């Protein structure tokens, strides 16, 4: 009986290890940090309330239950870290890196304006995950100055991240 259990466990581990082989250790660590930010109650599972709290932390209050339910239905069950990583792995297969990065910024832009408030982006970059230093923030604003309203064009940032040079602004 023990060999059967070992085989089942090995098969289960092999199934989940495939998703871990899709990413390098740095990427897995970044996904883990993102998971931890979203898992607001720190129970190891992302649920609807975690999503609601995450949206509230980003300034988006009154998210509709239907929207949260649709997000939760993308997973086949409870969203632990392995499921979270698998979901991103499936979404990123064959995806254009610029589209992926733009999509990440769009989550922070619920009105779809193509901009994010400088203050909000700076707060995220200096308090979450791989934190920016004050010098890195200064360099970023020099490269991507906000408009007079304090908004940052994230599409230009995405272009530079993926192509290495600013778009012609003509």
From Swiss-Prot:
Remarks, miscellaneous: This chain binds one calcium ion.
Lineage: Eukaryota, Metazoa, Chordata, Craniata, Vertebrata
Modified residues annotated as Phosphothreonine in this record: 26, 36, 102
Superkingdom in the source lineage: Eukaryota
GO molecular function, one term: calcium ion binding
Chain ranges of the EF-hand domain: 26-61, 96-131, 132-167
This protein's name: Myosin regulatory light chain 11
Modification after translation, per record: N,N,N-trimethylalanine found in this myosin light chain would not have been detected in the N-terminal tryptic peptide in PubMed:863872 and PubMed:352892 because it would remain trimethylated and ninhydrin negative after hydrolysis.
Modified residues (N,N,N-trimethylalanine): 2
Record Pfam families: EF-hand_6 (PF13405)
The UniProt record lists the keyword Transport: no
Protein source organism: Oryctolagus cuniculus
SMART domains noted in UniProt: EFh
């Amino acid at each position: 009986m023990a060999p059967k259990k070992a085989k089942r466990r090995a098969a289960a581990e092999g199934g989940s290890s495939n998703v871990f082989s899709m990413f390098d250790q740095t990427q897995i660590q970044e996904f883990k940090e993102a998971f931890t930010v979203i898992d607001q109650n720190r129970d190891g599972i992302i649920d609807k309330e975690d999503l609601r709290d995450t949206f509230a932390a980003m300034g988006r209050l009154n998210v509709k239950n239907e929207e949260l339910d649709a997000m939760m239905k993308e997973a086949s069950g409870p969203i632990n870290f392995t499921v979270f990583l698998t979901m991103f792995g499936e979404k990123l297969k064959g995806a254009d890196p610029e589209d992926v990065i733009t999509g990440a910024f769009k989550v922070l832009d619920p009105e779809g304006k193509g901009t994010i408030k400088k203050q909000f982006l700076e707060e995220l970059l200096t308090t979450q995950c791989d934190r920016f230093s004050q010098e890195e923030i200064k360099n970023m604003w020099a490269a991507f100055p906000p408009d007079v309203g304090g908004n940052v064009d994230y599409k230009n940032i995405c272009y530079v991240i993926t192509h290495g040079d600013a778009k012609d602004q003509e």
